[in-house]
Amino acid sequence: MVKAVGIDLGTTYSCVAVWQNDRVEIIANDQGNRTTPSYVAFNDSERLIGDAAKNQVAMNPYNTVFDAKRLIGRKFEDAEVQADMKHWPFKVIDRAGKPAIQVEYRGEEKVFTPEEISSMVLIKMKETAEAYLGGTVSKAVVTVPAYFNDSQRQATKDAGAIAGLDVLRIINEPTAAAIAYGLDKKSEGEKNVLIFDLGGGTFDVSLLTIEEGIFEVKATAGDTHLGGEDFDNRLVNHFVQEFKRKNKKDLSSNARALRRLRTACERAKRTLSSAAQTSIEIDSLFDGIDFYTSITRARFEELCQDLFRSTMDPVEKVLRDSKIDKSSVNEIVLVGGSTRIPKIQKLVSDMFSGREPNRSINPDEAVAYGAAVQAAILTGDTSEATQDLLLLDVAPLSMGIETAGGIMTPLIKRNTTVPTKKSEVFSTYSDNQPGVLIQVFEGERAKTKDCNLLGKFDLSGIPPAPRGVPQIEVSFDVDANGILNVNAADKSTGKSSKITITNDKGRLSKEEIERMLAEAEKFKAEDEAAAATVQAKNGLESYSYSLKTTLSDNQDKFDAADHETLSKKVDEVISSLDTMQSASKEEFESLQKELEAVANPIMTKFYGAQGGAPGGAPGGFPGAGGAPAQEEGPSVEEVD
């Protein structure tokens, strides 16, 4: 039986893990890396995902897509989307109010939704797991930031469907990290644990009580738009200004230069976690100008001061909401690559009167680790370590409906344990009102205009009655994924109307998901065809060059005419290879057959003259075999 996996779908990096042999295995990708960049690139001939995509980003900035998690489930006019677009070299367009990414692939313009890009990263993680487990992987638990709203969760689930995965559960990243921390600490009594999760693009804080395998989230807070990418942006802006000062030139208009600078900034940021100063050296960055500079840790901290400080607000909010004071928090666990920044560690430590945070779990892998444990539990693949484990998570935002005067009336308050169901009775606002419009919002503000509209629907056919008489029962039902279903019923007629919140037309329809799934299959077939073509080309190239080597090493042993015929053919093939950039697999194969037709008789004759072919002739030459003549056994002399 092939197992269900846990996938941490990150803004900048993703990670996949599986529960096997009574423990979690983090699965390395084909490059041997335990995390994979959440990058997808398109070029004239192929699609690249992961390390291969990130490695070529400077050469192909407009068609390399990353940060899809900062777009997923959002509206095009969101302030964050508009701000991010200034930093991205790829083109984001407005498609029916939602952001979509426009790239050039195989010479034509293509538009992808953030769900499709995320699904490509998920496919890469799925293939990584399949290579390791040796079978098809179809079930997964996928993680999201705890502060993701309903539409972002739903869109992530859709991305899983497009990738051909049955998403067993969407779980919150800090909760998954808490499992990684607490799995082996069952017998230690009740503990209050604060998870501080600062990744590449999102930030969450959750406070949990862990006792005997029960992980109960008391409160959660965060910012779905704060992470390492924002620190990189500050560095990039700083150096763009410095370059302008020194050279009177603005490199921000050049996507390739900006990308090379960003890569250097990301590297510098990492170095500054362990060194007090680092240098940046980029040859010919812009207009042929070399850019050599340095930056200290203190300067970096100053550039990001407000962002670093802002991470403390959610910590205070979680302590307030959970009514647990600082001194009662037993452990502070740091998760996410950005928690390696010394200033962040110091701020957290100072917040808890100088206590050192717990560093017992790997900040890059903890989330996938916890997701893998949850995947094992949901598929019944339990063992002693996981059998009594219970997760009780919460809804991150209040959810409710709009009542007269644009007031937000919450039915489910934030930090309510999910799954949960709440009902309330409402009535009509005017006499003989034939129907009501139920508008569903999420958020903490008093007026709905300041909250996020999740969806709306009509309940019609209410019998005429004075205002306030009809009784309309509205029920909110939040499932274990944190996704909301709403039902409204007129108690007198029993008429009801319900929706699964589909984010104000924002959600992909079943048909769209099926179309994207079919497209994903098509892309996969194209990727495989491209790989087969490369293989055919490489095979022909190595065959040609090994023939060439044999010809030049044994010039005197060949028949002169044969030598000339074959040399001419080999040179002809080698020069055609240089011009056959976009040839098909079949073209390479027919060229190989053509070359073999000339080479085989000549090489057979050559080896015959030598007394047998050397073990394995060039390029896997057919008819290879015998040992070289001089080694045909000991020579015997006749003795008188």
Curated annotation (Swiss-Prot):
InterPro entries per UniProt: ATPase_NBD, Heat_shock_70_CS, HSP70_C_sf, HSP70_peptide-bd_sf, Hsp_70_fam
Domain of life: Eukaryota
TM annotation in the entry: none
Positions of the UniProt region annotated as Disordered: 606-640
Gene Ontology molecular function: ATP binding; ATP hydrolysis activity; ATP-dependent protein folding chaperone; heat shock protein binding; protein folding chaperone; transcription coregulator activity
A Pfam family assignment: HSP70
Effect of disrupting the coding gene: Abolishes LAC1 expression and activity during glucose starvation. Abolishes laccase activity during calcium stress and iron stress. Severely decreases laccase activity during copper stress. Melanin absent from cell. Decreases virulence in a mouse intravenous inoculation model of infection.
Compositional bias segments (type: Gly residues): 609-626
Subcellular location: Nucleus
GO CC field: cytoplasm; cytosol; nucleus; plasma membrane
UniProt main location, coarse: nucleus
Biological process annotations from GO: chaperone cofactor-dependent protein refolding; protein refolding
Keywords, sorted A to Z: ATP-binding, Nucleotide-binding, Nucleus, Stress response, Transcription, Transcription regulation
Keyword set includes Nucleus: yes
Gene3D superfamilies in the cross-refs: 1.20.1270.10, 3.30.30.30, 3.30.420.40, Actin, Chain A, domain 4 (3.90.640.10), Substrate Binding Domain Of DNAk, Chain A, domain 1 (2.60.34.10)
Family statement drawn from the similarity comment of this UniProt entry: Belongs to the heat shock protein 70 family.
NCBIfam families: PRK00290.1
Job of this protein: Transcriptional coregulator that functions together with transcription factor HSF1. Positively regulates the expression of laccase LAC1 during glucose starvation.
Assembly description: Interacts with transcription factor HSF1 on chromatin.
Protein name as annotated: Transcriptional coregulator SSA1
Source organism per UniProt: Cryptococcus neoformans var. neoformans serotype D (strain JEC21 / ATCC MYA-565)
